Amino acid sequence: MADGHSNNNHVPVLLSFSAFSRPSSVPVGSGYEVLIQKFLSLYGRQIDLHRKFMIQLYSDEWAQYIDLPKGFIISEKCKLRFVPLETDVTILGNLIPATTVFFCCDMQERFRPAIKYFGDIISVGQRLLQGARILGIPVIVSEQYPKGLGNTVQEMDLTGARLVFPKTKFSMVLPEAEAALAELPGVRSVVLFGVETHVCIQQTALDLLARGFEVHMVADSTSSRSMMDRMFALDRMARTGIIVTTSESILLQLVGDKEHPKFKEIQNIIKASAPESGLLSKV
């Protein structure tokens, strides 16, 4: 089907960016993520990905563009535009427990022989899970095709996890996770760790970023089969505005003060340094 024409499954849309406007079509029921990808496919070379953007919908009632309503999905012919925010947004990376959620991605038994330094990233991941329980931070856990790849490794204690769900898609940003996030309306920061860095982690991070979340990628709790894949994925994520950090930095930022009532418990977690695994020094 040519762009600009509709059938039973697609509707025509006019997509505008800067001085350009192009007719296209999208499937009925398309939401924010599909529209973002459509804009990027049409105007990717002109869009500065270091800036923050928003989608606006043309309103016949108001005869002007308005911010895309929350939960908007395409149901009929419409006009949309992709506009930068007035100023570049500096990502400060501040973390507080009340607005933070942890995403633990696919730390499963069948990956153990293949993933570089798997034992070390599990050890660090367990620290993060323990810290989340102490600080009352929700944890969302995914398992990639558990029927074939097994469940989350036994070393990682998922007690109190808000959601543990199976998936086949690489990204964790699926209806189950989005529903859990919708029940946490104050959350703006996601701390992400797991495997593989260049596949499920990267796709999850980019999907979260597209939805307006501030993403903190825990470098000492993520790895891949190939260290080169891992290295380039971390570099790409950092360039798109994802904060690449470490587990100790995350935990201490969340308490923020030695007078915090939970500081001693967090201190006990990090007394022994995280494993010097070679994740940084070896490609």
From Swiss-Prot:
InterPro entries linked: Isochorismatase-like_dom, Isochorismatase-like_sf, Isochorismatase_domain
Pfam families, A to Z: Isochorismatase (PF00857)
Domain of life: Eukaryota
Gene3D superfamilies with a match to the protein in the record: Isochorismatase-like (3.40.50.850)
Similarity-based family: Belongs to the isochorismatase family.
Protein name: Isochorismatase domain-containing protein 1
